[in-house]
Amino acid sequence: MAIRLNKVTKLLNVGLSTIVKFLQSRGYLREENPNTKISPEEYEILNQEFHKDKHVKLDSEKLSKERFQKENYDKDKLKQIEEIKMGIPRSNEFQLLLTSKLDLDTLPQDKSQTTIEIKKTIKTSEIKEIKRENKTDILKERKQIEEIKNSYLNKQQKKSNLLSSTDSTINFTITGKIDLTTINNATRPKRKTKEEKQKEREERNKKIVNIKTEKTTQVNAGKKSIASTQTNIEILKRKKRNRIKHEKVNIEQQNISTIPNPKNKHFKFHKPTYKNEVSEEDVQKQIKETLAKLTNSSLKKGTKYRKEKRDTLLQLKNEQYKIKTQENKTIKITEFVTANDLSKMMNVPVVQVISTCMSIGIMVSINQRLDSETIDIVADEFGYKTEYVSAEAIETIIDDENENQEKELVLRPPIVTIMGHVDHGKTSLLDNIRNTNVIAGEAGGITQHIGAYNVKLDDGRKITFLDTPGHEAFTAMRARGAKITDIAIIIIASDDNIMPQTIEAINHAVAAGVPIIFAINKIDKHGANPEKIKETLASMNYLVEDWGGKYQSQDISAKKGIGIQELLEKVLLEAELLDLKANPKRYAIGSIIESSLDKGRGYIATMLIQNGTLKLGDIVLAGIYFGRVKAMFNERNLKIKEAGPSQAVLVLGLNGAPQAGDTIRVVKTEQEAREIAAKREQLQREQSLRTQKLLTLDDISRRIAVKNFHKLNIIVKGDVDGSVEALSDSLIRLSTEQIQINVIHKGVGQISESDVILATASNAFIIGFQVRPSLLTRKLAEKEGVEIRLYSIIYNAIEEVKSAMEGMLIPKTKEEITSNVEIREVYKITKVGSVAGCIVKEGKIKQGDKIRLIRNGVVIYTGELGSLKRYKDYAKEVTQGCECGLNIHNFNDIKVGDIIETFENIETKQKL
């Protein structure tokens, strides 16, 4: 179960920033927000790291608890001692009972001999053994003596009242006489002398000793009946006892609860109980014992059956919950899904998906399709499981592996991809090899498509070259080129450094497991330094053969043809080591390089045959499209009837433009191709529905928080699929927090009327890359007010969209102080108000400027300048060092010494 960071900080006794930094170092990207929730796995990692701080907190709490208990115990102890000193009465009761009855008829006539025997009896159950082990027992004994005296006096008084109410025939013995003449002679009794007080004190002490001696004798005799004694005790007072000193007891060490003595009923207070800290093992042991007691084996059959039924239902519910949770974490996808679609299905930012791919050595873009292996790795990183719904459609294609028999395999030409940075000489190298001028046909002299060419050398051997764009927008193209190639030539200009696109191309080749040959170009140019390039490669862990490494390299000049033959020899040598073979007699399998829509010929696709032979009339299946091969052309636009392994051809006859990177296969019948294509199209529609993300409350809140939020809708049309994908990818990456770019539609071919209607409905504009609208489309766009922008170089398209985004941003307002004026004199003029005579200290004051009145460093008023005069004439401006007169619009509270500051608000254009 997820737990918030603020709770984790309290549990682990660690600061929030420390926890966030630790999680970020472990790869968990977290914002420093106390309300952010973390998973149980992350909490377990934090617990392992900061368990020491947690124990420190627990120990501190334990010490404070013990200190608090000790203080409370000391307070209770002092309170009890005070109560004892105050003489709180105990529950002991002493009763005076008549031991016999007097027969009044048989009494002698002599009343003087009538006596009364007062017997005192004490309940035997009240006499307990007195132990003087500590101070508490001593205090108890004192209290008992005091109670004996008090209860005796009370009973004596009751007895006297009882006797006074008896029959008058009872005779009493006269023991003494009172002189009534001495009573009430004075209002106050006479003071006793010291000798009399001392005598009375000694008598009282003797009687107390007699009582104690009698009580001690009775206790030592055991639990026998105590004989009543005939006493005539006067009012007693207690003498202060000698204190018996005992050793001090350490309360902290005495961690055992005090158990009261059952024999002593006067036990009134208890020492505080100190319990030991309960360990986790004791708790678990106690739980097991309790469960064992509750689980009675001798239950009735009905009770046992109901219990088993409840357990079964609970287990079934838990299993259903687990299955439901697992289904929520399972995403159903097709095999070649784009990184953007995958991020939407997992509900994570696309940036995290791309960074995850880069961490495993795979360079991807937003709209680049991922293979099943990469999808599995990325989904597992975010805790999702994948289920490929297109497996059924793929399995319907029977790939007869038996056709790949050893005797039918023949050597095939190597497929070589030329990769590198912009303007490092990739196309120039290919021109020199083919003896043509490809660059002349490219806009801006920059390659913007994957070019596939077959080259036949002088000795009859063939090589298929793929020329990839070097611009950063064509990352997906380079990745596709690396996947379908056998050997990669990385071309580097010797007068330049190793650029980011060069490193990216090397990473693509290494990720695809393709052998690399480095071609260091422009060695004929002034300032060329091939050794510096080799040194840089060595620092990147790519050691060339000249430096004792395993990577081949060749210094060349693409313009002058220096080192070209040596480079081709190394390519063929590498191909021989790879032992590239294919079976030309089986059904063709290949990859789509580019696809486009030609007005006269329909949908055309450039494909590279990897195995088998493609013939005219074959039924091909590529992605969700299918068709019969109507015509095939080579790279020189010449018709051919068949294409063997490692050959690039242009195919006509498909019913749509398949995506670059799709696999093309030959199937037996058109019916089979139609069924598979329909099934794939259905799966693709389901996929698009899953990736549609509706506007949520969080999105609305975010847009409200980011003020002036804008959306820019774009429709992209291009000549080939690869260029459209690259341009769309680059435009989506321009999105910011304030402006979101949505490519609502992209496709190949001419800009049509349906594109204009879609742009009208969605308030979008159209970007055409090397395509033109028809005449009717242009008129409809003018009528509907839809803007169509046409480009032939990808740089220009990206820069203009960026400028349009900057124009949508609200300009920043910057305040600039233009002058500083000091008031020297103030004049009061009727119907005008206060006029200030000033001198311009700094800058230039102008008519109509906004002003700020400052007095003693505090802004008093902000407003506008009313009028400005130089001598007697109105002035448009007054420069530094000159005197002037002015007044402030609707404000007259000005004083000598005030400072007037003029300023302007300048708006500056925001940049992305």
UniProtKB/Swiss-Prot annotation:
Q: Where is this region: G3?
A: 467-470
Q: Which InterPro entries does this one have? A: EF-G-like_DII (IPR053905), EFTu-like_2 (IPR004161), IF2_II (IPR044145), IF2_N (IPR006847), P-loop_NTPase (IPR027417), Small_GTP-bd (IPR005225), T_Tr_GTP-bd_dom (IPR000795), TF_IF2_bacterial-like (IPR000178)
Domain tr-type G: start-end pairs? 411-581
| Record-listed GTP binding positions | 420-427, 467-471, 521-524
Q: Which SUPFAM superfamilies match?
A: Initiation factor IF2/eIF5b, domain 3, P-loop containing nucleoside triphosphate hydrolases, Translation proteins
One cellular component (GO) term of this entry? cytoplasm
Q: Where is this region: G1?
A: 420-427
Note down the stretches annotated as region G2.
Answer: 445-449
List, in alphabetical order, the Gene Ontology terms for molecular function in this entry: GTP binding; GTPase activity; translation initiation factor activity
Residue ranges of the region described as G5: 557-559
Instruction: State its location(s).
Output: Cytoplasm
Q: Show the CDD domains listed in the entry.
A: IF2_eIF5B, IF2_mtIF2_II, mtIF2_IVc
One Pfam entry for this protein is: GTP_EFTU
The segments labelled G4 in the record are 521-524
**Record-given protein name:** Translation initiation factor IF-2
| Native source species | Azobacteroides pseudotrichonymphae genomovar. CFP2
